[in-house]
A protein has these predicted regions:
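Short, contiguous acidic/charged loop-to-helix segments that flank catalytic cores in large enzymes
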Residues: 7-11, 148-153, 203-207, 249-252
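Conserved alpha/beta catalytic core and glycan-binding cleft of carbohydrate-active enzymes
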Residues: 9, 14-176, 180, 189-193, ...
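Carbohydrate-binding surface patches
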Residues: 241-274
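Anionic group-transfer/hydrolysis microenvironments
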Residues: 3, 39, 203
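Extended hydrophobic/aromatic segments used for targeting, binding, or gating
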Residues: 182-214, 218
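Aromatic- and carboxylate-lined catalytic core of secreted/periplasmic carbohydrate-active enzymes
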Residues: 204-233, 244-246
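Short acidic catalytic loops
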Residues: 1-7
Length: 274
């Protein structure tokens, strides 16, 4: 959490700052999995992609780009593909991306599909706290709904988001409860809520979403194409359109494009997004 503080020197952040260098060289810490939340509120606090090996880094660009794609924002197909393939614009050689769609701060995954706006009045700050831009949507009704069509649409969107996460190159981070549709009733800053807003209601699990997440996990464990951390190049994959032809520049630049296929040349595995 707030990892840039570990490498902040008088002239700014340095990935080779003494503390970070000592951690890499330490006989105990050096071979551990090191994970950075690469931003804080200090000067020069946003350092995504700069920690270097062996650090893994929370990738909020992944979160935002994937939410925007599934929200239906125009012109997002290129960013979607970049995140799906490991975020080569942020990392070199191997992906060190920790891919996530929701975290302890912000909306839960289910709330991303049920609330277009934050609802933080219970926090006592007149809804001023919490991020204002969540790249979320509500499927036509803000908040809780008993409309079966709305419920089905939200469940479909949650499944699509989970499927995207489990099909992405990099390390998966899934917040507790997101695998079965946990809601915070639109509260995106619930750290101080020790009540039903933040609690996990085990008896209220959406078993359909839970089964979908379980199946995705089982499948991913056997899929070396996704667990390999090497960044993908043209020799490894080809991006196809819905007709099975390589995407053209014009297709990549089409703001309305919503479909693509990621085809792995060696194994023949194809991931279809539509």
């Amino acid at each position: 959490d707030l990892a840039p503080a570990l490498g902040r020197l008088p002239d700014g952040f340095d990935p080779d700052a003494p503390l970070l260098a000592e951690m890499r060289a330490d006989p105990v810490l050096g071979d551990r999995i090191l994970i950075a939340e690469p931003w804080d509120i200090g000067p020069g606090g946003y350092q995504l992609g700069r920690f270097g090996p062996p650090w893994l880094e929370w990738n909020d660009r992944y979160r935002d780009d994937m939410r925007r794609f599934w929200r239906g924002d125009a012109g997002t197909i290129g960013a979607f593909a970049t995140r799906l393939a490991g975020s080569s614009d942020l990392f070199e050689g191997v992906t060190r991306s920790v891919n996530f769609l929701a975290a302890h701060d912000g909306f839960t995954l289910a709330d991303c599909t049920a609330y277009a706006d934050k609802h933080n009045l219970a926090n006592g700050e007149d809804n001023r706290d919490g991020h204002g831009e969540n790249f979320s949507w509500n499927n036509g009704v803000e908040g809780v709904s008993d409309d079966l069509a709305v419920i089905a649409a939200r469940r479909r969107d949650i499944k699509a988001l989970l499927s995207t996460l489990f099909c992405s190159r990099g390390t998966i981070m899934l917040t507790a409860g997101d695998e079965f549709g946990r809601s915070q009733m639109g509260n995106n800053n619930a750290y101080a809520q020790d009540n039903g807003i933040s609690w996990i209601e085990w008896d209220a699990r959406d078993r359909e979403i839970e089964a979908h997440a379980f199946a995705l996990g089982q499948w991913r464990r056997s899929c070396v194409e996704l667990t390999d951390v090497a960044l993908l190049g043209e020799g490894d994959v080809v991006w196809l359109d819905e007709g099975g032809q390589p995407l053209t520049v014009a297709q990549w630049e089409d703001p309305a494009r919503r479909r693509l296929v990621l085809h792995f040349r060696a194994s023949g595995l194809s991931l279809c997004i539509n």
